[in-house]
Curated annotation (Swiss-Prot):
Involved in the biogenesis of TorA. Acts on TorA before the insertion of the molybdenum cofactor and, as a result, probably favors a conformation of the apoenzyme that is competent for acquiring the cofactor. This is Chaperone protein TorD. GO terms for biological process: protein complex oligomerization; protein folding. InterPro entries: Chaperone_TorD, DMSO/NO3_reduct_chaperone, HscB_C_sf, TorD-like_sf, TorD/DmsD_chaperones. GO terms for cellular component: cytoplasm. Keywords: Chaperone, Cytoplasm. Gene3D superfamilies: 1.20.120.1820, HscB, C-terminal domain. NCBIfam families: PRK04976.1. It is found in: Cytoplasm. PANTHER family: CHAPERONE PROTEIN TORD, CHAPERONE PROTEIN YCDY. It comes from the Bacteria. Belongs to the TorD/DmsD family. TorD subfamily. The lineage of its organism: Bacteria, Pseudomonadati, Pseudomonadota, Gammaproteobacteria, Vibrionales. It comes from Vibrio vulnificus (strain CMCP6). HAMAP family: TorD.
Length: 215
């Protein structure tokens, strides 16, 4: 039983790390090519076997299929990334918890400090290349992947149960507290829909994962 849980933990971490990579930086041509590979398509087909994920996975696959016919797809997708995530909160969907959870909607608010506390508590080093406040979505998802993998060091059921409680608290307090608002913003400004569909998939996966952790 414990081995099955650990194997599933590896899959969960892998999904969070994959989603983190989507929000960390623009996709290169090489990375984009991989999305059309059999391996990635099989991975997405596997995710779509879950009823809760199927609609958002299908929307993401639809965006991938449309990318094949999109002129200068890599450049256009990089422009989408820039417009959505790097410009202004007024005309995009900035990927920071502070934007959505503080009254003034400014960067480096209380959510960033809370995230710093999570990182320090677990001694996790974030990707230095990101050079972003701690409540950037890519950092938060990368951290969650690390939190999950670290729990695989446990051998006793009660320790794993405690780890599940902590992981669920992180998902609820640090992610699902603002991701639906972030998703609404992205839906408003992402005309092509690649990143919007990725965010919807992330929200669906967080909700599903939370149900698994408390189940």
């Amino acid at each position: 039983m414990m081995q099955e849980i650990k194997a599933f933990n590896e899959k969960r971490a892998e999904i969070y790390w994959w989603l983190s990579s989507l929000f960390a930086k623009e996709l290169t041509q090489e990375e984009l090519d991989k999305y059309q590979s059999m391996e990635i398509r099989a991975f997405l087909t596997g995710l779509a076997e879950n009823d809760a994920l199927r609609p958002s996975v299908n929307a993401f696959v639809d965006a991938l299929n449309r990318l094949v016919d999109r002129q200068d797809a890599q450049l256009e997708l990089a422009a989408d990334f820039c417009d959505l995530f790097l410009k202004t909160a007024k005309h995009g969907a900035l990927p920071y918890a502070s934007i959505y959870l503080t009254k003034d909607g400014l960067l480096n608010g209380e959510p960033a400090q809370k995230m710093d506390a999570w990182l320090k508590k677990h001694g996790v080093q974030v990707n230095q290349q990101l050079n972003e406040p701690a409540d950037h979505l890519a950092i938060m998802l990368d951290f969650l992947g690390n939190l999950i993998i670290r729990s695989n060091e446990f051998e006793q059921d009660r320790h794993m149960e405690e780890a599940f409680i902590e992981q669920n608290a992180f998902i609820q307090e640090m992610l699902l507290s603002w991701l639906p608002s972030f998703s609404q913003r992205a839906a408003e400004y992402d005309e092509f829909g690649f990143y919007n569909s990725a965010i919807k998939l992330l929200v669906a996966f967080c909700m599903l994962d939370s149900d698994y952790l408390v189940g």
